[in-house]
Amino acid sequence: MIISTTSQLEGRPVAEYLGVVSAESVQGINFVRDFFARFRDFFGGRSQTLESALKEAREQATEELKARARQLQADAVVGVDFEISMPSVQGGMVVVFATGTAVRLK
């Protein structure tokens, strides 16, 4: 399964557009480690806790996007876009939304 942020794949023309597919992943963030991450963020350091949660959420959303595209018998998902949200005021979770267009290639 090909996943691409571009609307076309070089050398692989689209035969059929199958529809929009979407997926989401929610990851909790460890509050104790996140407390120390806030200090690093304040002083300009990188937050491993948040980076790990974002990476895991993005990977899970991508796998779910592939699964939903396979249900449509797609060869690829093009025009993929990721949106990140932290809905909790305390920053206790991160949500990644992934959307794209499932296509069948020639």
From Swiss-Prot:
Matches recorded under InterPro entries: UPF0145_dom_sf, UPF0145_YbjQ-like
Family: Belongs to the UPF0145 family.
Protein name: UPF0145 protein PSEEN3024
